C-alpha cells in the first residue's frame, strides 16, 4: 500500500505510460515489425508529444519496455520447491517455456529484427537471455553438474530458437514439442 500513487496527476501519468508500453507489446505480438512513434501514437490515440513527455527518446522507451517484459516473463517462471521431483520441475518448466514462447513469438521475432538496429534492444535481449538461463538453472540446478558443452546443449533445447524450429520448420504442435523437450531433458539429466 505504501507504494500506491495517491496524486491524481502522477497516477494518470503512470497509467498513460503503462498504456503506451502495453500497446507496444500488443503491436509486437500482432507481428508489427516497424513499431515507430507515429504508429504508437495512432494505436494509443495519444499525440506523439505526449509519448515523448513520458519517454524522452527511443532508448528510454525501449528500457521501460524491457523492464515491463522482464517483470512479466521472469515473474511467470514456475515456483519450485526443493521437494519437487526432477520430472515435476522439468514438466513445469517446459510447459511454461512452450506457452510463453507461443504467446510471445512475434515479440521474439521483433527483437531479432531490431537487435542489429538498436544498441538498447541488443542490451535488453542479452539481459533477458542471462535472466532466462539463470531461472532455468534455478529450477533445474542439476544442469550445473554437467560439463560446459552439455550445459549449453540443455539450455539450447530449452531456448526459443529450438522451440521455433520445432514449431515452424517441423510443424509440431506445442504438446508434441513439450514431449520432445521432456524426452531430451530426461536423456541429458538421466531420469526415467
Feature roles, as predicted:
Residues 57-63:
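Short amphipathic alpha-helical segment with a characteristic S/N-K-E followed by hydrophobic residues
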Residues 46-55:
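Short hydrophobic/aromatic patch on the recognition helix
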Residues 26-29, 33-35, 63-92:
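Amphipathic alpha-helical linker/stalk segments
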Residues 106, 119-152, 179-190:
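Amphipathic alpha-helical packing segments from all-alpha helical-bundle domains
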Residues 66, 78-79, 98-123, 164:
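Amphipathic alpha-helical segments used for helix-helix packing
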Residues 151-174, 187-192:
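Amphipathic C-terminal alpha-helical segment
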Residues 1-34, 38-43, 60:
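Basic, helix-initiating cap at the start of DNA-binding domains
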Amino acid at each position: 500500500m505504501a507504494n500506491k500513487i495517491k496524486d491524481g496527476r502522477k497516477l494518470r501519468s503512470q497509467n498513460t505510460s503503462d498504456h503506451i508500453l502495453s500497446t507496444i507489446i500488443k503491436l509486437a505480438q500482432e507481428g508489427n515489425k516497424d513499431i515507430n512513434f507515429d504508429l504508437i501514437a495512432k494505436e494509443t490515440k495519444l499525440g506523439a508529444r505526449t509519448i515523448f513527455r513520458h519517454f524522452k527518446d527511443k532508448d528510454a522507451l525501449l528500457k521501460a519496455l524491457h523492464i515491463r517484459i522482464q517483470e512479466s516473463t521472469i515473474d511467470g517462471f514456475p515456483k519450485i520447491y526443493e521437494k519437487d521431483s526432477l520430472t515435476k520441475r522439468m514438466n513445469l518448466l517446459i510447459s511454461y517455456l512452450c506457452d510463453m514462447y507461443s504467446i510471445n513469438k512475434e515479440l521474439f521475432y521483433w527483437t531479432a529484427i531490431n537487435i542489429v538496429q538498436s544498441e538498447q534492444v541488443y542490451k535488453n535481449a542479452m539481459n533477458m537471455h542471462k535472466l532466462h538461463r539463470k531461472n532455468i538453472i534455478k529450477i533445474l540446478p542439476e544442469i550445473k553438474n554437467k560439463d560446459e558443452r552439455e550445459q549449453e546443449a540443455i539450455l539450447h533445447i530449452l531456448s526459443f530458437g529450438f522451440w521455433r524450429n520445432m514449431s515452424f520448420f517441423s510443424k509440431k504442435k506445442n504438446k508434441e514439442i513439450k514431449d520432445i523437450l521432456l524426452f531430451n531433458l530426461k536423456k541429458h539429466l538421466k531420469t526415467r
